[in-house]
Design a protein with these regions (language model features):
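DUTPase catalytic domain/fold
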Residues: 1-142
Length: 142
């Protein structure tokens, strides 16, 4: 799918690192240090025009999470089709050491997803005739 993009950074456009990658890696357009338990809004220099009926989700990179405890705070972040501002990524440091972000570092990935708008059917109660019913939060076991 064709998505219009403006790149005001010196970085490459978001890239799919393998043929099977669902997400395209996006890079930092600034330097920052994220302290342990701290978070920062990292600018990318990217502006997109997403077709109506779609969104872009901003998701963590698994390597940053596993190796450094760095993840996207509001994961997945949503970029709506009518947003035209710069893409920013809120990163949080769950690690024990300060984490340096440099210009050009791959900080997150973006995934284009179809959006279905909900048409509500308001009822007084829901059909509770399922085996699970209202059980949740670990009720199916470890």
């Amino acid at each position: 799918m064709l998505v219009k993009i403006v790149n005001k950074s010196s970085n490459a456009l978001p890239q799919f690192e393998t043929g099977g990658s669902a997400g395209a890696d996006i890079r930092s357009n600034q330097q920052a240090i994220i302290q342990p338990v701290g978070y920062e809004l990292i600018k990318t220099g990217l502006f997109v025009e997403i077709p109506y009926g779609y969104e872009i989700q901003i998701r963590p990179r698994s390597g940053l999470a596993f190796k450094n405890g760095i993840t996207v705070l509001n994961s997945p972040g949503t970029i709506d089709s009518d947003y035209r501002g710069e893409i920013g990524v809120i990163l949080i440091n769950h690690g024990t050491e300060p984490f340096d972000i440099n210009v050009g570092d791959r900080i997150a990935q973006m995934v284009l997803s179809k959006v279905e708008h909900i048409q509500w059917h308001a009822l007084g109660s829901l059909d509770s005739g399922t085996k699970r019913g209202e059980k949740g939060f670990g009720s199916t076991g470890k």
